[in-house]
Amino acid sequence: MAYSYSEKKRIRKSFGKRSQVLNVPYLLTIQLDSFDKFIQRDPEGLQGLEAAFRSVFPIVSSNGATELQYVSYELGEPVFDVRECQIRGTTYAAPLRVKLRLVTFDREAAAGTVKDIKEQNVYMGEIPLMTDNGTFVINGTERVIVSQLHRSPGVFFDSDKGKTHASGKVLYNARIIPYRGSWLDFEFDPKDNLYARIDRRRKLPATIILRALGYTTEEILNMFFETATFHIEDNRLLMTLVPERLRGETAAFDIEANGKIYVESGRRITARHIRALEKDNITQIQVPTEYIVGRVTARDYVDLSTGEIVCPANSEIGLETLAALAQAGYNEIEVLFTNDLDYGPYISETLRIDPTYDRLSALVEIYRMMRPGEPPTKEAAEALFDNMFFSTDRYDLSAVGRMKFNRSLDIPEGVGTGILSNDDIIGVMKKLIEIRNGRGEVDDIDHLGNRRIRSVGEMAENQFRIGLVRVERAVRERLSLGDLDGVTPQDLINAKPISAAVKEFFGSSQLSQFMDQNNPLSEVTHKRRISALGSGGLTRERAGFEVRDVHTTHYGRLCPIETPEGPNIGLINSLSVYARTNNYGFLETPFRKVVNGQVTEEIEYLSAIEEGAYVIAQANSNLDENFRFTDTYVTCRGEHGESGLYRPEEIHYMDVSTQQVVSVAAALIPFLEHDDANRALMGANMQRQAVPTLRADKPLVGTGMEKPIALDSGVAVIAKRGGTIQYVDASRIVVKVNEDETVAGEAGIDIYNLIKYTRSNQNTCINQIPCVKLGEPVGRGEILADGPSTDLGELALGQNIRVAFMPWNGYNFEDSMLVSERVVQEDRFTTIHIQELSCVARDTKLGAEEITADIPNVGESALSKLDESGIVYIGAEVKGGDILVGKVTPKGETQLIPEEKLLRAIFGEKASDVKDSSLRVPNGTSGTVIDVQVFTRDGVEKDKRAKDIEEIQLREAKKDLTEELEILEAGLFTRVRNLLLEGGVAQATLDNLAREKWLEQTLDDEAKQNQLEQLAEQHEELRKEFERKLEIKRNKIIQGDDLAPGVLKVVKVYLAVKRQIQPGDKMAGRHGNKGVISKINPVEDMPYDENGQPVEIVLNPLGVPSRMNIGQILETHLGLAARGIGDQIDKMIKQQQEIAKLREYIQKAYDLGHGAQSVDLSTFSDEEVMRLAQNLRKGLPLATPVFDGAHESEIKGLLELGGLPTSGQITLYDGRTGEKFERLVTVGYMYMLKLNHLVDDKMHARSTGSYSLVTQQPLGGKAQLGGQRFGEMEVWALEAYGAAYTLQEMLTVKSDDVNGRTKMYKNIVDGTHYMEPGIPESFNVITKEIRALAIDMELDEA
């Protein structure tokens, strides 16, 4: 494999036995693709905004005289870019302008004659835009719209599994779910009658729906039943025989024909009997009269002479009926064929309980159910029923719904529309009856073929359509009012409802979430999250076990591991690594096609619906060099996801990769295959909580997924085009683009500005650090600068720490950890947290608040860190209570007593009419001010500090643009110089001229002269473009800010807090092995090995066996080997051994094992080998892919190569006594994370503070400055000790005895330390509550 310049800096050795067939796809596709479909920059096809507009327009007035037509739409450019929107606290959005056409028809002339057309662009609000990283900036904060997993539209057949009725009878039901519109349910009741419900309302007999569709009783029976025919001949009753129908019944009489008895009375009719009847071609048999009694007629029988109905359809036949039929001249009677086995009489029974008799009565019944209390009219009843299922405005199955519907009812694809037809409804009822009759299966609702993904674009489109429908109502009313002379489309449209709907969705929908920005992984997983909650989804309380469970169809689509613990378990899932959604919104996963036992390179994506029909082999099946299966029988997933053994020629597909089944976070856990699933779940979830450390450190033991995640997360800076590094410093990188990647006429320069020390949503620090040097070549898509938690373009969430598994004086009891002081000294887990504090100056009734350094009654020392505008300096170190922004608020005039007036008159005006309302640092916080931003309302004069900030921003912007111009000019003048030299101008002449003068030279060659003139024009263009860009920047910087009503000024102060690791902080490995630091131990007391190297963290070995996460042990061993090889390389470099030896050793390390990866160092130059070796000194980075990782033999081989014992255990000595520990101890390197659960954020103390209103007990929680709850069990503990007075104090004066605590306070002030407990307030509350129950309670004096 060929490596690029930057890849050669550090190569991760992979243990993967199988070569990668398919690269990891771009991880944010689900978000970006969905939103692109929504806004379609070049609308084609009916989706997104285009579909929404087309579904609502044209809007026609009620009289048809005018209509408002939609022509096209365009999205403008956003005013501010993403970064500016975040700073200003605005939404990153683009204006939507729609071209509408108002057409007026001439009423007098022929139909369709146009009288007037007005076309106009109408503003329809702002549409939030997605950033390149799949997020939205709403009011300055980054948000993510999580995709939703909801039940697909279509028809579903289900049963209650015998839970509804006491008898345990299974009741079947069918439900037609449209994308939008009314739900239609059919269900059996315990008596086997079929009922229908519309929108889950009161149930009606299902035949009412059929009658409302216009069917008569006879037609209904005809559709659902086969008939049996009886003939009356010479007083004999003959039945037309269909032998197959008799199977399984017991003969009630002798079945005979032509004198031969085929079945004796009382015998069960079997297939043998039927064959005999068919062989002899028996078509009729004689039956006793009783056999027809109780049967049901299939049609109306009318007395032809009188026109009177002798026997209506669906009536039971009795002896009288037979006589009446014979009298009316009928000798052939058709009855319904039913039996108790597999042809139930359900529809016939339902018709008997149906109170309606024709279409109108059925429509009225439906109207009464839907609109109780309203008087039904024929028109209203018809309109209601039609609008419910047969109107495209109110009902839409959608393409997905129609596809699922047709699949379920075996209708050919492409048949049918978005609304229901009569055949659709009848088809559903027929299939439901078939299932009740024992033919056919119910659907599995949790199958991923029945649940689909709704992503951002689709949800935004639905919200937009809701807004449009509101507008449509208003427009239609306005059009119907008439008098449209001089009215333009702009006058008709009010964009507020649209803006409101869109704003509500992006701002406060349950699926629009504050982005989890702890680290790059948490960003990526948040964008790939799939939630079953949200509008139109499930609710936590109602979701049962089945919905939450892992389903066979999750394989390769949703991760079976990564899901939250707690009430949302199983409802919130994560997309698997290779999963994607298809056009219908169903999840697909890729497979390699297998033809005749030969695995091909062809890759096909299958959805859960399609996958069920195939036999699929696992990714780790053994193949030979020709990609044929080597085993006689291969373990595969067969039909319905069941596992089994199959021969190679029976296999259709093979998995693409071993990590196909898990999500991105789970794919980061090395040796995942050796961890218990519950712990792996914790490991995957805790990686998302890791705080970026000061210096990122790549994991020695990784899985190979680190690079794709870091690149796709968008936190690092990636080269858009290849080139060489022309300039690099901490805040910007300039790349000179390769000639072949530039566009003609451009200078070929890319400038990347880096993000420095900004705050993330979780208050962690976002900072980018260049990882390239001047003059280095870079390729397109390669890393230029590392972001938070990335190291040379690889995800680095924690630190490689030397750990030992052993008890140490009880300091690692119950998952605690003992940490060496060295870890603190080296700042291994030091993190920076940035807090934003803001001060708002408002316009109050009594006058404007003012930001100033002149604050009443505050000493000089308190103002020492403020400038003349009253705002803190950048770089000031502040602690709790310090003033950051001085602010005074006017207070109401107070009446002064004469003495005060006199003092005022003598000593001058003391600022009495204002009170201090400055912004102070919250208690318990200290840090350094790293940035201040001042926002001033338009029309309010800016203070000096605001002007200074503006100056700096202008200078920065100008510097950026000037630099860009200089680089562009340099490129241009190089071409001019070459042209002039070719044209015969002497080198010396050029050296003596200023560069601008070169363009004024004249050349003899006309073609060259033309080229020179073109270059001169280009130079002029560059200058103009520079001026234009500078002007735009300048206007943006100096314009006033759009602040909330009544706000004059906002000052935001950013504090950076440096947090070292300390006891009480939570740490974890990647295998769910979490714990809290119990003690920071001096280095000299830590256990050390024979070389005197102390361990850094001591972990408890008892945390491993019961938790069954053995992966951490294997990681520790492999980490030790990786570090051992690094140490050997380090030794060789220090001894300055020749490069050949170094190259040989490193090659040996890369060649070890049976991995598919091959690294050939012979293609590397000496300089490249040296650079690689320098980067490997801290350890050889290894990748052990999920389910395809390193074997025990490979780990031992690496340990040997590193000169370490193959057991992975070494002798340790006690740091305090120097004595040897009696057993060997497992020591190695584990990748540890510091989680965002820091003791600083949790620790809190209170002496006195606020109390709850009713109970008068102290509030709870740090945010409320609450107290510690002394609960039931703590009371028992004090009771057990017999500590009566302590208990009394706890329950009275320290809690809710109001008088007692005020007295106590007074006593302490007076210096007399005794308490007088009284009655606790909560006792009074319970007394009042008992009195509220009308029980009087009086207190006696004790």
Curated annotation (Swiss-Prot):
InterPro entries: DNA-dir_RNA_pol_bsu_ext_1_sf, DNA-dir_RNA_pol_bsu_external_1, DNA-dir_RNA_pol_su2, DNA-dir_RNAP_su2_dom, DNA-dir_RNAP_su2_hyb_sf, RNA_pol_bsu_bac, RNA_pol_bsu_CS, RNA_pol_bsu_protrusion. It comes from the Bacteria. PROSITE patterns: RNA_POL_BETA. One of its GO terms (cellular component) is DNA-directed RNA polymerase complex. Keywords: DNA-directed RNA polymerase, Nucleotidyltransferase, Transcription, Transferase. Pfam families: RNA_pol_Rpb2_1, RNA_pol_Rpb2_2, RNA_pol_Rpb2_3, RNA_pol_Rpb2_45, RNA_pol_Rpb2_6, RNA_pol_Rpb2_7. Its EC number is 2.7.7.6. It catalyses: RNA(n) + a ribonucleoside 5'-triphosphate = RNA(n+1) + diphosphate. GO terms for molecular function: DNA binding; DNA-directed RNA polymerase activity; ribonucleoside binding. One of its GO terms (biological process) is DNA-templated transcription. DNA-dependent RNA polymerase catalyzes the transcription of DNA into RNA using the four ribonucleoside triphosphates as substrates. Belongs to the RNA polymerase beta chain family. The RNAP catalytic core consists of 2 alpha, 1 beta, 1 beta' and 1 omega subunit. When a sigma factor is associated with the core the holoenzyme is formed, which can initiate transcription. This is DNA-directed RNA polymerase subunit beta. It comes from Glaesserella parasuis serovar 5 (strain SH0165) (Haemophilus parasuis).
